[in-house]
Amino acid sequence: WKDFESLTGIILEEKDFDVTKNLILTQPRMEIDVVGKKLDLALLIDCKHWKNMGKSTLDEIVKKQIERVKRFVSIENMSALPVIVTLHQETIQFIENVPIVPIMKLSSFLDEFIGNLDSLKSIDG
């Protein structure tokens, strides 16, 4: 799965994001797989390479990622979006306005998300 996180980081770098992988936050300890920063916005990405995640599993993943984003913006002075990147196309594309993006569509998501910011969950610092 580290290769999956690396690939996610490479795609972000190709789109001119500053990338940090495996960012550790403390109190409480949390790890963010990939952070992509561009201008005053950060994408906090949780990489999931599991197959066929059900809605309850995705709900829990999204809830935890939102908590990580809240912690991140309490430290960093910028807005951030939680994003879940998956290895496979999931039937669910959004939970609580958090995008569930298959890796094969990450590049086009990065091209388009700025225009869709008002429909995505953003947490301000």
Model feature map: region roles:
Residues G9, K37, K55:
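Extended, folded domain segments that form the structural surfaces/walls around functional sites
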Residues E31-K37:
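Short acidic loop-to-beta-strand element that houses the catalytic metal-binding Asp/Glu
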